[in-house]
């Protein structure tokens, strides 16, 4: 009955060790993941259980809850602590509930989540912040807690990819590391303290990730931002998108671009498992005067893609996963008119996952990239090492 077991073992061993035959150019040779960016936010108001459920239905492997805290210490899923653009807060509460705060060095007057209790937040309903998207679901869906998102994700067998929003700001409101400690304890209770958990914790700041590296084995991802892309294709670094804000607050000079140098990646590898760079960091582009997206204007989004910048390859050499963002059906660019083709290009370069507002398009992009016949066999063998903890 078991006479073929030795042969199968040899085949799996051979597949694992035959690097040229890897199914994908990802770090582990495994299929890249599709992350529902704020859920299926291209279709439904972002950061709602309904948006997350649709992302799961469309085939997303992970859903992304951005996290802020209420005044009574509950995590809720919002892209920013400011509630104005993504909820109907102005129709429920008067202007006297607005406050003026410094957020990443920018004076901001708004309705801040951390001045509302969870009970008050639960009276709000989400709205679609992008005017070009379907507004018919405005006012229908609640603002979910992290606990509610976890229950949904676990019930559907998908992972979560939470982002800690504005840790320096949150420390000023709640105290040093309260934000991080609460997240770690919540995730440990739900998933255990293990790198095998279907969870990634991400942040644009660095100090919070370094702190959490000492508190958890759950995988951590360093996000890398920029303000824009310059006319020559270089990255524009303008505050507040020039540096991680914890570095600004500490008087440091390290920029986001510095994080992607060889030295920067080596440093990240000491406290995180991956990087999350904005997608223009990954592609070299050339201006050649062609209107590739057909909008009648020749601009930065029409630049011809001219290969990799080497960031993906360098990150993989440092043992770091690469998850890039954000792909949108209604805002493709950087040399591509077709959003699925854009994602396919990044997938072929070797990114380990993509964030998209339209998870169905992401799933289609992954399916469209050819795989060798050995993929299923390699998946069986490589799955044994897929969840290893890389940082040290």
Residue ranges and their predicted role:
Residues 1-4, 371, 388-392:
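Positively charged n-region of N-terminal signal peptides that target proteins for export
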Residues 8-9, 42-43, 380:
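Intrinsically disordered, low-complexity segments enriched in polar/charged small residues
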